[in-house]
Amino acid sequence: RTAILKLISQCDVFITNNRLKSLVRAGLDYDSLKDRFPKLIYGLVTGYGQTGPDVDAPGYDGVAFFSRSGMLADMAEPGGYPASAPGCVGDGATGAALFGGICAALLNRERTGMGDFVETSLFGNAVWLCGTMSAFEQYGYHYPKKRSEMGALYTFYKCKDGEWLHLAVTQHDRYWKPLAEALNVPELAEDERFKNAALISRNRAQLIPLLEQAFSQFDYDEIAARLRERDIVFDRMRHYRELATDPQAVANGFVKEHIYENGHSFMMAMLPVHMRNMDETGTGRGPQMGEHTDEILKQYGYSEEAILRLKEAKAVKQHP
């Protein structure tokens, strides 16, 4: 604890994802530190928030973010298996929220000289991101949905070559007729059942199979060209494995090659924010647990003997 307090005394921001009860027990919670370090920005990530019945519950991305929010259950069709949670997506969203809060707290400290406590949680971020769906539920628009209950012009269709296309038409009056023409079914736009947006929504269960049949007559590349000509919003449903080589991702620097010390390389996802007047962040791996322990402790005046004693007491660890 003494070593940690030395680090805190000279840092701008202290970040932890330990549970509150553990922090209180160690005397490292915000209330225990704020008077001693009034300029400290204290960042805390929790699973479920600062209070409530689950305040001390452990939480991971797949559980506190995806499962608790309803994302996994309600992205699947009724009666089917829940969707699989993609790894670390909730962690990334929560980290971005914490980053924004810390930046705001640092700016406020520049103005007032005071530090602050910045807290965010996996569950809280999931609730925020699913706020639209939560509102829909309160107004009678329920999940999960069968395919026949989805918007006929804002859903996915399978092409002749097996590729899936996600269609996203929201301006029905502008794009419904061009879409029907692109699919070689212009008569659908004149059909009394589908003459306007209200009728398309009301009769979507009848329209979806007709559009499924129409899309099944085209390979993806062919129908994609026809849709682009008409400025219709769509994209191919792709796979994680394609991200590393996606031409658009590469062109924009969304992925960059990183070479490890052992010579192995891979395409690393980069921060999705670019600034013209600041240097871009390069690629690089995160440090191993305890990789810089000796280096940091020496910076704070610890001798080799003192560091060895800390290791023997298992108070710190240096990665091999």
Describe each model-derived feature in a short phrase.
Residues 1-24:
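Rossmann-like NAD(P)-binding element
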Residues 13-14, 39, 233:
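Residue-level detector of anion-binding/catalytic polar loops
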Residues 229-281:
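A glycine-rich dinucleotide-binding beta-alpha-beta segment and adjacent secondary-structure elements
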Residues 305-320:
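Amphipathic terminal alpha-helices
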Residues 263-309:
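Flexible, small-/acidic-enriched active-site or ligand-binding loops
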Residues 153-230, 234:
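Aromatic-enriched alpha-helical interface/lid elements that frame and gate functional surfaces
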Residues 10, 22-169:
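Active-site-adjacent "lid/gating" segments in soluble enzymes
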